[in-house]
Each structure stands twice: as C-alpha cells, then as structure tokens.
Amino acid sequence: GSSHFIYPEASIDIQRHLGSDIVMAFDECPPANVKESIVSKAVERTNKWTRICYDHLKKTGPIYSWSQTLFPIVQGGTFQNLRKQSAESLIQFSSCGMAIGGLAVGEDKSAMFDTIALMDEVLPKDQPRYLMGVGRPTDLVKAMRHGVDMFDCVLPTRNARNGQLFTSNGIINITNTEHKDSFDPLDENCNCYTCINYSRAY
C-alpha cells in the first residue's frame, strides 16, 4: 500500500462518492487515560474540522439522487467539562443526528457510562444518538437506557469469525469439542429464528 494524506474535505468527498446516507465529520479520537490538555486539543481540532466538513458538504451538493446528512462526532474523553463543551459546540452542525466518539478505547467502564449519561442530558432529544465502537450486548442495553439509538462495532463479526456466540448466559465458544454433537439450543432463553432452528452441533 501507499500513504495518503486525508484532510476533512477529502473525507467528505470520499463519503459523497460512496453515497453514504450519514456522512461522518472528521474527528480526532485520543487514546484513553491521556492528559486533559491533550484531549482539549483534540476537542478543538474536532470542532474546527467539523466546521470545515459542514461547509464543504453544503458547498458540494449530492452526487446521487438522495440527500446526505452530516453527523458531528462529540469528543472529550471522559472529561465531563470537555464532553459538554464539545457537544454544545457541535450541535449547530447537526440537523439529523450526532455521534458519541472516543469511548470504548480503554477507559474504565463506569467512566464510559458516566459520559454516556452526560450525553443523554446534553444532546438533542429529537435527533438520533450514535455511540461509536461499543458492541457488547450488555453495554448496548445499558447505553439504550441512556438514550442511545445507534451503534457500530467490530465485536459481533470478529467474535463470530472466531466461533463465539453471545447468549443470555454469556459467551459460548461454539468450536469447543463439547458442542460438536450437542443438539442443545444455542440459547435456551431465546426465541429468535436462529435459536429455535439451529442447535450447537456442527
């Protein structure tokens, strides 16, 4: 492969050509447990980039026959003051939804949910909230209780690829030999199509 410098306008152009219904603003996601000053600079940069993305999206117009909308991405780590500042600065660029970024990157789980609870208070109630990178079923349910509507995460496909199933009793490693000839349901507490029609046997 080769190196490419991607700047905010280029990010918007790429998403325009992909035909994304939801175009994500360019953002900086700092790692967990860094100094507040570093996270503060990431918030400033994200705010600046979001303005550029917003202006460029308005200026360019859709390529295809449908409209595309911009989701700003709130940053700020687990610093409540920076999260609030980021959200309040970015609301002006949102008409259809906002993303909560920079979580599930190694921070303490309780700090993550404190931040999600703050976002429930600060973000518009009449727009979808998209929590990026969170995928454990128990975390999804808890986040939904705090007003989150949308999620994305590599976890379901990555775990499935490695033979893991999420069940109401925890994770099952389906490739373990104990399941090879087992006609037990995948999850005895679930009535979904898969659990009713497929067993653990393979």
What are the residue ranges of the model-derived segments?
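Short, flexible active-site loop motifs that bind/organize anionic cofactors or intermediates
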Residues: 1, 36, 102, 133, ...
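C-terminal extensions of enzymes
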Residues: 27-33, 187-202
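Hydrophobic/aromatic-rich, well-ordered segments within soluble, folded domains that form packed cores
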Residues: 12, 68, 197-201
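Non-catalytic, usually N-terminal nucleic-acid engagement modules in DNA/RNA processing proteins
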Residues: 1-65, 177-180
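Residue-level detector of alpha-helix boundaries and kinks
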Residues: 31, 35-38, 75, 104, ...
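Glycine-rich phosphate/ribose-binding loops and adjacent secondary-structure elements
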Residues: 47, 56, 60, 65-186
